Amino acid sequence: MEENRIKIWIHKIKDTAVVLLHFLAVCSPLSLVCVTTPELLAGETIGQWVWFGKAVLFSAGCIVAACLLQLFDGSSWKKMLSFSCFSACVSWSLILLGGIEAVWGLRQLYGFSASGHFRYALTGSFFNPGPYAGYLAMVLPICLHHYIQFGGWKWISTSLKLEKVAAGIVGVLILCVLPATMSRSAWIAAGMGCIWVICIHQDSYKSVSYTHL
């Protein structure tokens, strides 16, 4: 009995480590968005390219480590290469980086961090507010999706509650920063994206309710 419990715990730890390695493999290249090189001239991208090269090597190492963990556990090659949690890793990487960008923008608004352009008070890690607002507008519907996809609080697990809280906090931070960017196109994009997410979830709720009738 005790041996079975130990095996179960080892299996859970292995699965958690594999998911974490997959997340790091996805998040490291996407973290390029947060790389700034204020010491270089405007338009120079050599710093970003250097970071991207290192991130790709780190990502490859994480993928190899995850495959080895699964191989030692006796998993099939199909399971190892399926990368079943890829979409979740991408979503949560964008949410994490979107939260960092939102906090970055708030710090610039209140004068705790320097802007990326002398003409604008709010740029995040970007050179001007336009791309910054577009990035936040892209992340906001993802936050909304993760907040409402599991419904209410009563019947979900603690881990899903933590996911809802994290997505909700990042969404609120983005809502605090996005109006200050003064980018109407980003406002429209964020609004249309959120409306689309709400419509998709309403359709899924209706289909679930019809199946229970």
Regions found by a protein language model. Name each.
Residues V35-G43:
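Membrane-interface helix-loop junction between the first two transmembrane segments
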Residues W9, D15-C34, K54-D73, K79-F118, ...:
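Alpha-helical transmembrane segments of multi-pass inner-membrane proteins
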Residues E44-G53:
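Interfacial loop-to-helix junctions that mark the boundaries of transmembrane helices
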Residues M1-I10:
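Short, Lys/Arg-rich, polar N-terminal cytosolic tail immediately upstream
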